Amino acid sequence: MFKVNEYFDGAVKSIAFQTETLPATVGVMAKGSYEFGTSQKEYMTVVSGSLTVVLPGSDKAETFTQGQTFIVEANQRFNVTADVESSYLCCYE
């Protein structure tokens, strides 16, 4: 069954599911800046909109747009800014 998650007072919502190979979530972010933590390695693909990300170990922001993926290792924290309402697919390894 699906599990619905809500973060940052409802500004970020996701639905967890199992792909053929990995657990995943598909979600949406309202405009804003957020800090996330990982417990597993995450492959995050922007489905629509754009996300500006400061990855662990970097102080440089990178912008990812539709179809682009970034990777965050397990047990890390990272910052994301959504300049517009955006959606994503995140697979966990």
Swiss-Prot record:
PANTHER family (alphabetical): PYRIMIDINE/PURINE NUCLEOSIDE PHOSPHORYLASE, PYRIMIDINE_PURINE NUCLEOSIDE PHOSPHORYLASE
E.C. numbers: 2.4.2.1, 2.4.2.2
Gene name, Swiss-Prot/TrEMBL: ppnP
The keyword Glycosyltransferase is annotated on this UniProt entry: yes
One term of GO molecular function: thymidine phosphorylase activity
Protein family: Belongs to the nucleoside phosphorylase PpnP family.
Catalysed reactions, as listed in the record: a purine D-ribonucleoside + phosphate = a purine nucleobase + alpha-D-ribose 1-phosphate; adenosine + phosphate = alpha-D-ribose 1-phosphate + adenine; cytidine + phosphate = cytosine + alpha-D-ribose 1-phosphate; guanosine + phosphate = alpha-D-ribose 1-phosphate + guanine
Function, as annotated: Catalyzes the phosphorolysis of diverse nucleosides, yielding D-ribose 1-phosphate and the respective free bases. Can use uridine, adenosine, guanosine, cytidine, thymidine, inosine and xanthosine as substrates. Also catalyzes the reverse reactions.
Species for this entry: Cellvibrio japonicus (strain Ueda107)
The name this protein goes by in its record: Pyrimidine/purine nucleoside phosphorylase
Pfam families: Ppnp
Top EC class, one word: transferase
Domain of life: Bacteria
Keywords recorded for this protein, A-Z: Glycosyltransferase, Transferase
GO cellular-component term (any): cytosol
